[in-house]
């Protein structure tokens, strides 16, 4: 069992002021996997002061110094690979292969992308006799969700370090182990004291005072819309900059010239990947009437081949839902789909056979879903596909954009002109054509209620900078 009862503040592991702890539950076993410190306002105050004290010094470090720091982090991150994989499997229930090939790898990708972005990043630009300067914004508060313990953490931390902004970081209390390992990595490579501060705890005890602190100049949050809204309101009191990556209800448009087997495989993966606990999950599968029956046969077969189970068993592809609360929410949405008249094609309520222990859900397909139904409009955060039929391309695009969200979209087909038309028409911050995949140097963020700002690569670095113009600098 993992016991981490200290906070990491000003380059040291220190006792949490409250002396209280929180239990972390392994969702695959429903047993306690470890404990962490339950931080409070006093811990946040100490962390912010430490970050504020080092701000000017860190802001004025050279690009090369920060790039070298990121490179050292990359090397030590690789050294801790097995520790990170095991931690993520314990806290999230991610299958070992997913923990390695997705979670661990995405964290590494973001540190490398930020490091490499500094090669060409322009912090200064001459315009005639004048100078435009980009400089670190100052103390930044980071709050990350439970579904990607290294990805969401690394992309924010790497960007802040590259920009020269010290941080106070609150990971999710449900998946804090990987964040603690990152703190150990930073400590070993010598991240300057105060530049990185880790305060574990819950939203009320840590998240709220961090969002409200007058010395915090920027908040970067990934999570639910209601929490993002609450952070914005708190930040508005002293006009903090806010970067938000929130929910999604992403469309996956299948074109009538698509390879059926390839489309079914791609669409199924976008639903069951990470147990459906993905803000970019393509859960609204929008299929042309002309190929719908063939597609349904194929996608049902793909779902039947998915192995749900013990994340430590070889071959497991899908692990548990993160918690009892989240499991119950997924079950409620499945019940709602049935109640509203969608056709249950595969899966349904309850747990897969033989998986009584752990928060395992059945991968589920609903057919004949109307886009106005609850399961088509609200983020479920579980492995649930809603198949919606369209008759022409304009209707497909209209359905895709008929949502309050705009985080991601997908299109699968053969004709390049049609693929391009659809990709440009989807109202979302990220669109993938034929499973192209998102590279870590591309901007990531949402339209509409899916967020504010952009992350990843040089766009992520920009979020942690202020822009200053100096007139007459070269006179």
From Swiss-Prot:
Its EC number is 1.2.1.3. GO terms for molecular function: aldehyde dehydrogenase (NAD+) activity. Keywords: NAD, Oxidoreductase. Pfam families: Aldedh. SUPFAM superfamilies: ALDH-like. It catalyses: an aldehyde + NAD(+) + H2O = a carboxylate + NADH + 2 H(+). It comes from the Bacteria. Belongs to the aldehyde dehydrogenase family. This is Putative aldehyde dehydrogenase SSP0762. It comes from Staphylococcus saprophyticus subsp. saprophyticus (strain ATCC 15305 / DSM 20229 / NCIMB 8711 / NCTC 7292 / S-41). The lineage of its organism: Bacteria, Bacillati, Bacillota, Bacilli, Bacillales.
